[in-house]
């Protein structure tokens, strides 16, 4: 029987199931954070056998209240549903890490654990919860609505939050640096003698590149509170300063996840600064950009959804955005670059080489 608004019973049941998925979705990151706090990914990773029984897992959990042990299989059940762990019933209720679960292992070279913990920081969650209020006020970002100042000013004023943010960027950089020096991006750094990593944070990417290419001088440029007392060695150097003021001269410049933090006007301004600081195209000059290229790739719905959510995050946090290829091309031309090449082998993000 159809209801008055022409929704059949089957459609209503399907809609209700979907709505409950949205309602309960707040528990997903909470359960994952709980697993990280308990050290479950690390315990499974360090276990001698790939499959660990439930009883052994419970015994290995530090500081677990004995009265709460019955909750662990409940927690593990939902984490299996999320795809973090495999469940092996025939091995005595055993568990093993999935590829996604391995990304939550502490200090894993391909991990994004620190980025997950940053996303669950109260300051970040407060921003997301303030979007409705922000849409009614005159402030530039929801971050300012929630926390009273811009993201960058907040980082400069709050050492704890700044540390969590830098850890997240460093974790992502470790993952990305492994891809950059792999076959995925073969040839990008070949022939270069000097490289400036703008906004390179703690230097994770530059260190990996410097290690893979000993004859390539790598300079990390970032703000003083980010560089702090970090010292370089060998072919790695740290320079404190603003990218909008002065960029050291080099063959090439690396912008990893930088431009999506800024609006079009500031991006063009920064790209012009980069163009002034690199060699000519004939001498190998280029700017290497690692950023997202928005696309409607309907063959990968999860990728598209992640890109849409990332675009939303950039808009409410920095008053910036993710960009389509046409939007990128417009920036490059306005900044005076002659051409570009895209390497689409970095999953959610792409590598773009632009030439003076």
Swiss-Prot record:
One MF annotation (Gene Ontology) recorded for this entry: O-methyltransferase activity
Annotated catalysed reactions: quercetin + S-adenosyl-L-methionine = rhamnetin + S-adenosyl-L-homocysteine + H(+); kaempferol + S-adenosyl-L-methionine = kaempferide + S-adenosyl-L-homocysteine + H(+); myricetin + S-adenosyl-L-methionine = 7-O-methylmyricetin + S-adenosyl-L-homocysteine + H(+); kaempferide + S-adenosyl-L-methionine = 7,4'-O-dimethylkaempferol + S-adenosyl-L-homocysteine + H(+)
Keywords: Methyltransferase, S-adenosyl-L-methionine, Transferase
Binding residues for S-adenosyl-L-methionine: 222
Entry annotation: catalytic residues: 260 (proton acceptor)
Keyword check for S-adenosyl-L-methionine: yes
UniProt EC number: 2.1.1.-, 2.1.1.82, 2.1.1.155
PROSITE patterns xrefs: SAM_OMT_II
Top EC class for this record: transferase
UniProt record, GO biological process: biosynthetic process; flavonoid biosynthetic process; methylation
Signal peptide from the UniProt entry: none
InterPro entries in alphabetical order: COMT-like (IPR016461), O_MeTrfase_dom (IPR001077), Plant_O-MeTrfase_dimerisation (IPR012967), SAM-dependent_MTases_sf (IPR029063), WH-like_DNA-bd_sf (IPR036388), WH_DNA-bd_sf (IPR036390)
Protein's pathway: Flavonoid metabolism
Record's subunit section: Homodimer.
Recorded family membership: Belongs to the class I-like SAM-binding methyltransferase superfamily. Cation-independent O-methyltransferase family.
Functional summary from the UniProt entry: Flavonoid 7/4'-O-methyltransferase involved in the biosynthesis of polymethoxylated flavonoids natural products such as myricetin derivatives, aroma compounds possessing antioxidant properties and exhibiting pharmacological activities such as anti-carcinogen, anti-viral, anti-thrombotic, anti-diabetic, anti-atherosclerotic, and anti-inflammatory effects. Catalyzes S-adenosylmethionine-dependent regioselective 7/4'-O-methylation of flavonoids; active on various hydroxylated flavonoid substrates.
Stated name of the protein: Myricetin 7/4'-O-methyltransferase 2
Name of the gene: MOMT2
């Amino acid at each position: 029987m159809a209801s008055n608004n022409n929704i059949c019973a089957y459609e209503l049941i399907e809609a209700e199931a979907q709505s409950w998925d949205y309602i309960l979705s707040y528990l997903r990151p909470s359960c994952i954070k709980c697993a990280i706090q308990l050290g479950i990914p690390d315990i499974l990773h360090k276990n001698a056998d790939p499959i660990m029984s439930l009883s052994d897992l419970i015994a290995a959990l530090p500081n677990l209240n004995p009265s709460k042990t019955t909750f662990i299989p409940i927690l593990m059940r939902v984490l299996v549903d999320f795809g973090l762990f495999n469940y092996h019933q025939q091995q005595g209720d055993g568990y093993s890490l999935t590829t996604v679960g391995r990304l939550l292992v502490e200090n894993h070279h391909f991990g994004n654990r620190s980025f997950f913990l940053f996303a669950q920081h109260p300051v970040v969650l407060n921003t997301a919860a303030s979007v409705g209020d922000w849409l009614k006020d005159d402030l530039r970002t929801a971050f300012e609505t929630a926390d009273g100042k811009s993201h960058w000013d907040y980082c400069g004023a709050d050492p704890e939050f700044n540390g969590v943010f830098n850890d997240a960027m460093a974790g992502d950089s470790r993952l990305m640096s492994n891809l950059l020096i792999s076959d995925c991006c073969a040839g990008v750094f070949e022939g270069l003698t000097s490289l400036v990593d703008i906004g390179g944070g703690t230097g994770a990417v530059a260190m990996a590149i410097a290690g893979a290419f000993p004859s390539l001088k790598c300079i990390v440029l970032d703000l003083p509170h980010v560089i702090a007392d970090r010292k370089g060695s060998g072919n790695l150097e740290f320079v404190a300063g603003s990218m909008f003021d002065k960029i050291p001269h080099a063959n090439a410049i690396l912008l990893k996840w930088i431009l999506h933090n800024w609006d079009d006007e500031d991006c063009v301004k920064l790209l012009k600064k980069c163009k002034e600081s690199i060699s000519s195209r004939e001498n190998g000059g280029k700017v290497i950009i690692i950023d997202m290229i928005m696309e409607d790739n309907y063959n990968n719905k999860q990728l598209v959804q992640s890109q849409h959510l990332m675009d939303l995050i950039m808009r409410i946090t920095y008053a910036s955005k993710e960009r389509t290829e046409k939007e990128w091309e417009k920036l490059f031309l306005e900044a005076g670059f002659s051409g570009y090449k895209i390497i689409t082998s970095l999953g959610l993000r792409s590598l773009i080489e632009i030439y003076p």
